[in-house]
Amino acid sequence: MLSSIIHNTDSFIASVPKLKRKKYGQFFTNMATANFMASLFCFDLTKPELHLLDAGAGTGILSAAVIDKLIQSGYTGRIYLTCYETDELVLPLLKSNLELAKEECGINYEIIQDNYLTSQLFEDNPLFSDNTKLYDYIIGNPPYLKIPKEAKEAKAMPSVCYGTPNLYFLFWAMGIHNLKQDSELVYIVPRSWTSGAYFKRFRQYLFKHCVITDMHLFESRDKVFDGESVLQETIIIKVK
């Protein structure tokens, strides 16, 4: 299944100019990276159902990698996958790829065509979290894009923003917000969050709510996204 989705994605990438994808911070994960990210999860195979989240799902590569890993691990329960995606160019392929996953693996899926960051309430306060949808396993390759401090996404998450924020750490913070207790999140992100005043509030939020259990730094930027030029050093990180 994953190899078919990778093939479909490669065809899509070839059809969309790189500058257009760069404008939205889109960099699609290759198969080796997706499989490695999925391998970091310690799945609880005893649960009768598992809820997965892929925010900014793109063509569904990471979702497929997690599903593949679950099936290979012998999981026989129900799998519920939620994907957020708003790119009209990508959506038809995402739907097609998830239909393939449904046919081959029997998953249930939902595609939410809404802004992941502004469509739900983000508050660093449990009193505001009663209606938050929570997930067992969250995987993500968020967009790498600086936004103005006046952007609606920044205004929706003021407690983690300072100065000029980047979408990737806002996605990451919201992912932590959507994570069930003692569950796991694996993201691929730039290394820039580790230092600097712009990321201080996010780091405080991260270490208040999570523990970092795994971190992988790539030797070469070229190994992460096939055929893409990513200037920032990139890491894969797992928290719970």
Predicted regions and their residues:
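S-adenosyl-L-methionine
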Residues: 1-46
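Generic structural signal for well-ordered alpha-helical scaffold segments
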Residues: 38-43, 67, 71, 176
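Short, conserved SAM-binding/catalytic segment
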Residues: 94-107
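Conserved SAM-binding strand-loop segment of SAM-dependent methyltransferases
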Residues: 106-116
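Conserved S-adenosyl-L-methionine
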Residues: 68-80
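Conserved class I S-adenosyl-L-methionine
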Residues: 48-58
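Surface-exposed beta-strand-to-loop junctions
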Residues: 13-18, 74, 152-153
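Signature of N6-adenine DNA methyltransferases within the class I
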Residues: 22-23, 27-36, 57-64, 78, ...
